[in-house]
């Protein structure tokens, strides 16, 4: 028999990915209830950000800023409440694409060439040939991500990416498949291919 827990699912939030989080959080809550767990759903953007007193564990279904950037994780760690996912420091480092890139370079992990841009009047970098990928340095998923084929589309794409964050990472475009590997307690899980619809 599986132990039953009182789980609080954090969903929604105030990021650009709110709608996705509401859907995924509702699906998580349904699945947990089907397994016999007690479930409360809390939306930090709507309710006073507090946890029900009976909470034993928090399932993080928040996305983007405040959900994946270490802020909510830090708060839960301060409260001493166990939660799903990466700790506050790991979340903050992974969410910041520029800091992640530095860590990759320090550990000889290959990643596309890139430069940081924070000015709307910046021109395409001479060191990276087109096409370019522009993305906010601190946003989740593909929020504000733009594929720029040539200099003609540069200004519009840069303005869009900057609108979603104050700093943009410009990288060379690498054609290929998107693969991801989760890590659980230091053990790499099987490789999964991401295939957007």
Predicted regions and their residues:
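ATP-binding N-terminal substructure of ATP-dependent carboxylate-amine bond-forming enzymes
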Residues: 1-102, 106, 118-125
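Glycine-rich phosphate-binding loop of ATP-grasp-fold ATP-dependent ligases
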Residues: 21, 112-113, 132-159, 178
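Glycine- and other small-residue-rich loops at beta-strand/loop junctions that grip anionic moieties
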Residues: 61, 92-93, 114, 146, ...
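Structural detector of well-ordered beta-strand residues that form the stable sheet scaffold
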Residues: 84, 112, 133, 169-171, ...
């Amino acid at each position: 028999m599986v132990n039953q827990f009182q789980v609080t699912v954090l969903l929604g939030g105030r990021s650009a990915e709110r709608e996705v989080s509401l859907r995924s959080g509702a699906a998580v809550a349904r699945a947990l209830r089907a397994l016999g767990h007690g479930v409360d759903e809390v939306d930090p953007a709507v309710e006073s950000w507090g946890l029900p007193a009976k909470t034993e564990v928090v399932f993080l279904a928040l996305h983007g800023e405040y959900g994946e950037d270490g802020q909510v994780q830090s708060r839960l760690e301060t409260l001493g409440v166990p939660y799903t996912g990466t700790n506050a420091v790991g979340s903050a480092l992974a969410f910041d694409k520029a800091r992640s890139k530095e860590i990759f370079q320090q550990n000889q992990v290959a990643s596309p060439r890139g430069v940081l841009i924070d000015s709307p009047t910046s021109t395409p970098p001479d060191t990276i040939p087109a096409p370019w990928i522009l993305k906010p340095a601190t946003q989740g998923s593909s929020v504000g991500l733009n594929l720029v084929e040539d200099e003609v589309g540069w200004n519009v794409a840069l303005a869009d990416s900057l609108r979603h964050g104050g700093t943009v990472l410009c990288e060379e475009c690498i054609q290929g498949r998107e693969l991801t590997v989760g890590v659980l307690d230091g053990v790499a899980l099987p490789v999964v291919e991401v295939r957007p619809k």
